[in-house]
Amino acid sequence: MHAPHTATALRRTKKLPPLRVGIGGPVGSGKTTLLEMLCKGMRERYDLVAITNDIYTKEDQRLLTIAGALPEERIMGVETGGCPHTAIREDASINLEAVERMLARFPDADIVFIESGGDNLAATFSPELSDLTIYVIDVAGGEKIPRKGGPGITKSDLLVINKTDLAPLVGANLDVMASDTKKMRGERPYVMCNLKALDGVADVIAFIEKKGLLTV
C-alpha cells in the first residue's frame, strides 16, 4: 500500500486545520471514481484520509480499498441509514463525528475527502462539514442536466461533467452542455472529464490545490 510522503509534502501550514473536500452528485455519476483518482494522484504529496457515505452498506469504502486508493485504515465508511442529503447538510453530525475520529487517528492529515451518498441536484454540503465542494454529473444523464440547475449545479465550487466519452452514444452535444453550464454557473469553474481515462483529473487536482491554499 502507498504511504503519503508527508516530510516533502506541499502542504498547508500546520496552523490551519486540514482541508475538507466534499464530493457529491447523483448515483452512478462517478463520485467514487473521482475520489479514487484524486487519492492516487495526490497521495505522494499530501497526507490524505477519506470518508464515504452509503445508506445501508459500506460499498464505496470497500471499492476504494480494493482499488488501492489509500491504505485501508485511511478510508472510513459511514452508513447514513436514511436520506444522504440529510447526512451532509441538515444533520451532518454523523459525518462530523467521522471526520473527528479520522483526525484523531491521523492528526497530520492535509486533506479529508468526504464523498456523499448518491443524491439529487438539490444536495449541498454543510459549510461546517466541507471547505470546498465538488459536484459530479455525467453525460449519460442527458444533455439537459446542466439546464436543470439546483444547488449542486449552480453553487458548487467545482462542477465535474464526467463520461464525456459517452456523448456520441447518448446523443449529447458537449458544446451545448458547456454553454448551458456557463449560463447556469456564471464564473464558477467546471471541468469536462473522462475519469476512467484520467482525462480531466489533473485539472481537478489543480483546482483543489489552488482554492484550498495547498500550493506554496
Curated annotation (Swiss-Prot):
GO MF annotations for this entry?
Answer: GTP binding; GTPase activity; nickel cation binding
Q: Which UniProt keywords apply?
A: Chaperone, Cytoplasm, GTP-binding, Nickel insertion, Nucleotide-binding
InterPro entries (alphabetical): CobW/HypB/UreG_nucleotide-bd, P-loop_NTPase, UreG
Q: What are the GO cellular component annotations?
A: cytoplasm
Which superkingdom? Bacteria
Q: Where are the transmembrane segments?
A: none
What does the UniProt function comment say about this protein?
A: Facilitates the functional incorporation of the urease nickel metallocenter. This process requires GTP hydrolysis, probably effectuated by UreG.
Which protein is depicted? Urease accessory protein UreG
